[in-house]
Every structure is written in C-alpha cells, then in structure tokens.
A protein has these predicted regions:
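PDZ-domain C-terminal substructure recognizer with occasional recognition of PDZ-binding tails
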Residues: 200-203, 217, 230-233, 239, ...
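Conserved active-site neighborhood of the chymotrypsin/trypsin-like protease fold
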Residues: 26, 30-41, 48-125, 147, ...
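Protease-domain processing segments flanking chymotrypsin-fold serine proteases, especially trypsin-like
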Residues: 5-14, 18-49, 133
Length: 288
C-alpha cells in the first residue's frame, strides 16, 4: 500500500479510477501515455460519458527509486508529479472530444460543513465534509485556491478521485491526501476552465502581495510589469480585477488564474482616500 501523505506537496495521476454507479453521472479519471513525440509527460483525462471534460498535462513526472512508473491496469501505482511550479504546470491539451463541462458545483455555493461524498471501488459511498478554500499546504503555495475537505482517516479518497456534493454535482478532483483524512481538491471550476479555454496561459500582473495579509495591499511591483506600466503604485489596495471583488490574497489568486490573458484588464485600487481605476492593462502571459 502506498503512503499518500507525501503527496501533499504535489499531484498524482491515478492509473485508472472508475466512479461507481452510486453517482448518477458516469465519471472516470484515466491516465494515458503522452501524445507529443518525445514529451516527458503523462496525461490525466477526466471524462464524462463520451465527452471529454478536461485533459491536463502535469509539468514533470518524478522517478521513485530510479524507476519511472508506466501506465497500465488498476494495480499500476499512481504517477507522482512534482509541484516545482506549484501546480502552475497544468495545461490543457486540446481535444476534439471536448463537448460540455458536465454538471459542476457552481462557484461559491459550498458552505463550511456541507456534505461531500465519493464512491469507492467497492461501490460504497463515503461521506465527508467541506472545510473551505486554501491557497497553500504547509510551505507550498498554489496559483489558485484548492478545496479542503475532511474524510474518515481510514476511508480517504484516492488521488484522482472525483468528489460530489449532496446533489451529485462534481465538486473537484483529489490532488492530495493526508493520514488524518484531510484532502485537497482541484475545484470543478478550474477543471471546467481548463476544458473550455485550452488556449489560456498563466497570467502575470507583476505585483507582490503579502500571502498572510487579510487586506490585498500591493507590497511591491516588478519594474516594467503590467501594473507598473498602468500606473499602479506600491501601497495601493486592490478593490477588483475586471469587476471581480478582491478582498484578500486568495481572491487575487483566483481572479488571475481564471483569466485567459488575451484581453485587456480593468483594475480598481484604493490610493489614500481615492478610488483609482486603470483600464487597458495587458497582462504578461507565461509562454510555457
């Protein structure tokens, strides 16, 4: 039996996980061989019925004891993926099979204490609880907030397992688990975004915020960066990005993660006693 605790700082791709019939929407997560010639990637494909929901390419695959795992049947160990880019290495592989986003839990509808569930390989449904959204696990921070859930210690979902809410809507896919039953999930919104925006690249605005601050104060700016060019100043407090409210560091992460990077932005900040609006800001796109 694999020790899943170390995966808190990374992602893993399950060899093959089939969602049980207890959940009305047939859902599976399947790892397939890389498609690009010479590319050292594994691909995680989340599929609903015959329609492709998402196809994610991890940034890099780790070797365990000098042995690289090859994909096979259900007994194949999960591929552990290094979080060097703090989950920013997830990219969408274009697929002609992408048709729809499936039945997803709307963003922000979950409340602390809401019931979550997943179905085991034995068709047994295990109940858990939604804890909240987190932008870091230990010393590892991420480019978007992950869903934190709690399941029984002896019945945690495996890596790659889809989890659902009380109305059987997809909440997210498990990225990491701990021995205490704590799980972190890639939100359904992120899966849908990656599926419907395969051309999207990571967006950078060139500003620094304090990860521990409860107020989104701009602590620093990168010279020549998008916000610096737009006249944003150190000490400004973010109000919104493209009319998305920014109340804290986590809001800032999500607001930038779900940008496609191909359209100018509008940003509002508080400067002293004034509200300042900057429009036409062109973000920097990460070419990777």
């Amino acid at each position: 039996m694999m020790d899943l605790a170390p995966i808190l700082t990374g992602i893993a791709v399950a060899g093959l996980i089939c969602q049980a019939t207890a959940v009305p929407v047939p859902f599976k997560v399947e790892a397939i061989l890389p498609q690009a010639e010479g590319a050292p990637y594994a691909t995680m494909a989340a599929q609903i019925g015959k329609d492709m929901l998402a196809s994610l390419i991890p940034y890099r695959v780790l070797k365990n004891g000098g042995v690289t795992y090859h994909l096979g049947d259900k007994s194949t160990p999960p591929l552990q993926v290094w979080a060097q880019e703090k989950l920013t290495g997830l990219h969408q592989r274009s697929s002609p099979y992408i048709r729809r986003a499936g039945r997803l839990t709307p963003s922000g509808i979950l409340k602390h204490g809401d019931k979550l569930s997943f179905a085991s390989s034995k068709n047994e449904t295990t109940q858990g609880i939604y804890v909240g959204m987190e932008h870091s696990i230990g010393e590892t921070s991420f480019p978007l907030r992950l869903i934190r859930a709690q399941f029984p210690k002896l019945a945690v979902p495996p890596i790659g397992q889809p989890c659902y809410d009380s109305e059987n809507r997809l909440v997210g896919i498990v990225l990491g688990v701990s021995r205490k039953g704590t799980c972190h999930l890639l939100p359904a919104r992120a899966i849908s975004f990656l599926a419907t925006h395969p051309e999207a690249k990571r967006v950078r605005l060139g500003c620094l915020l304090d990860i521990n601050s409860s107020t989104p104060v701009i602590e620093g700016l990168i010279n020549g960066g998008p916000l610096a060019r737009a006249g944003i100043q150190t000490g400004d407090i973010l109000i919104n990005i493209n009319d998305t409210p920014i109340r804290n560091y986590g809001d800032m992460l999500d607001a930038t993660y779900y940008l496609t990077g191909d359209k100018p932005l509008s940003i509002e900040v508080i400067r002293g006693t004034q509200v300042v609006t900057s429009k036409g800001i062109l973000p920097t796109q990460d070419p990777r």
